[in-house]
């Protein structure tokens, strides 16, 4: 329900901005129909393809290996833990994978709640207690149960569409104003070089600004996944897991994977551009019960 509400509210906000831009620039809506269709195709196309290929891409990026049959006691424990927590959360058993990395980390991905993947690093299995590891796995199971991957795709698609459409509308106006040779009664599309240059710069700038929205949601869903873990295995286990993460190596996963991992990179120019809240804030949120209500 929340996923649909977020999608509708975001789309409503985008359409309001579209209307304002068209009114302020004097551009007729019929002249931008093709541009809107293109923006939708490009904006959602990349996000949807990424979602559909997310399991394959994630495994390739970290060199993960799916466990088909447990080969040792650790793999058996991991499979049993994921199976038990999946039943508790009311989702189908995800695929389970292990990848080699010294940092303590794990991630969940997949296009659907009932066709997902949970992967953990060897660093997690080697450096966390079973209670702490259970909490991390429960955090990832909560991401799946909450439908976070799909929600992130919808938000990213709307944001992408907004960036493409607004950038090119402004570029069209700028090209017509700066480079058009317009006779009375004739319409000019302006200088194509100016249009291309302005559109490229604006897409870059608006893309950076728009990432604030997606990063905010990424941080928001981390708080809720922490709370989901606390409900599955207990608050103290999740707090202990987060405290253990404070002593971990800086994550080595690719930047494109950070939003899906439990342990995000701590170095950023601003918290606005972080995929994860600071660990201290996550611990405090659990202690206060802010997201457990």
From Swiss-Prot:
The keyword Cell inner membrane applies. GO terms for cellular component: plasma membrane. Binds 1 zinc ion per subunit. GO terms for biological process: proteolysis. Its EC number is 3.4.24.-. Zn(2+) binds at residues 139, 143, 222. Pfam families: Peptidase_M48. The active site is at residue 140. It is a multi-pass membrane protein. Keywords: Cell inner membrane, Cell membrane, Hydrolase, Membrane, Metal-binding, Metalloprotease, Protease, Transmembrane, Transmembrane helix, Zinc. This is Protease HtpX.
